[in-house]
Amino acid sequence: MIINSKIKLALHHLRTGVIAHPTDTIYGLGCLANNPSAIQTIINLKKRDITKGFILLASDISFLMPYINSNMSSKLFQKLAKPTDTPTTYLVPKSDELSPLLAGDNKLLAVRITSDPLITFFCENTGSALISTSANLQGRKVATSKLELKRYFGNSLAFELPPNMYNSNPSIIINLLTGVRSR
């Protein structure tokens, strides 16, 4: 991936706020997982039910460790860290200290390790996992253009990368403890 001035500017804004960016699945809104103010901004922007929680994206399991219950078996940690051919979100036991902003009312936390170059760049340059959610208002279709982003969010986003390089399919979701696929 070529790191251009737009990506560097997105990184700058990601450190303190909410950006719109392509992911390995859909066009999304993102912020640092360790920034409660930005997480609350996403909840407010999307008019999102706070009981739902978010997906955490990371380029490596090390970025997810502060959020996952450390009592999970080493076998499950190995499975979580293993690369997958298809974008796969795992539901994992959450840390006892986890902010309710991240998992909502859920007993499990949604996490995805991705080799997406943009997410990798963001994680490695911030030292943090990212919150990920679709770029839409709750119950509406995902934005696929800057015009739709403006309709949904006005000028509330800190920065927007163009939605020109994403896959339009959501990830599959698997409960890591039971192996049951829910999407």
Task: Indicate residue ranges for each PLM-predicted region.
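Active-site-adjacent structural elements in enzyme catalytic cores
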Residues: 1-183
